């Protein structure tokens, strides 16, 4: 990460401390016998814990919360039967992404996507529904770390529903 050197200058042990918190999460999950996961953005955690079991972007769960329409690849390490949720993307988000991929061959930052689609029938769709980069563009502030570390609500709901089969059975019975 581009911030590692400044973090390391402030605290040479910052990465070890983060790994310790992740290991504590893993141990509590194992001791409790429940599904568990810890997350971290793409980082050096893979050199400590191995490759992530699952990765996602918040926009992939906009079917459960449209406020999460942004990019931020996040890695999960999981255990004890954790079930990764199925993607649940809002149809308009999916259509906007498809339009950009059709025109450009791949996803790209929203500003570039809007420029590339400008003047086409998809311009409004992409402007309104294409995932933004708010996390990466978040200016330095006292709240930046909290904004970047907040769990996306749509993903949190999807994880809960995937890992609470007893509640799904109650819902089906109702």
Predicted regions and their residues:
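Conserved active-site and SAM-binding loop architecture
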Residues: 1-174
